[in-house]
Amino acid sequence: MALLEVDNVVVRFGGVTAVDRATFTAEAGDVTGLIGPNGAGKTTLFNVITGLQSPGAGVVRFDGSDITGYTTHQRARLGIARTFQRLEAFGSLSVWDNVLTAAEIHRRWQRDAGDPRHVTADLVERVGIAGFSQQRADSVPTGTARLLELARALAIEPRLLLLDEPSSGLGESETETFGDLLRVLALDGRAVLMVEHDMDLVMRVCDVIHVLDFGQVIATGTPAEIRANPKVMQAYLGTYADVVTSAEQVESEEVEAPRG
């Protein structure tokens, strides 16, 4: 059974259907991509999964239970964490205190959770922001702020981690390291669900990709299957041709790389 199940979800804003009978899953241990053109409904679906948006129809299940009517904090207590496109850190607090605050809140929910200071020290090191620990969150580079958002989400020890454009603002080497970290987070037993426009990152780290267009899931498959899907090519038009070329170059380099 999938950890997350989105089943025939519909969201309408007035006369506009933002999400149209969307159905997909995310498995524990996998990095799952949710991609599509701008306005396809990706962030709206994240809002439905986390309880910020009520669907007009459909069901969201977590670990087999219907959570469609749950509040955001009830879902967080179940182990659902999220980052946002817009940075949401407490700007006047240090990087350290931002993560510590999240860890302390989790300790109140779950008394057997680790010591908040130890958790914070581990997370700032793990995501690569330890050198910025004492800086105010509103003074760090955008890429660092993105990693801070990830550390705060991880502080509640989530079983399902939703990341909305997490590589935005990261440099090339930072993005590569970030992708490796996502694989580790999934291998630890989490389900990682990612909305991302960096197709090189998506194709490299995702086990499964769902493609949205006009609020509908038009394709689901492995990166190789998605690259070859004509519906996806049509949805992306010329942009997707660049994605295919880039992904094929990465694949070719991996094949040609010397083996130790």
Q: What kind of feature is each model-predicted range?
A:
Residues A2-G260:
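Glycine-rich phosphate-binding loops of nucleotide-dependent enzymes
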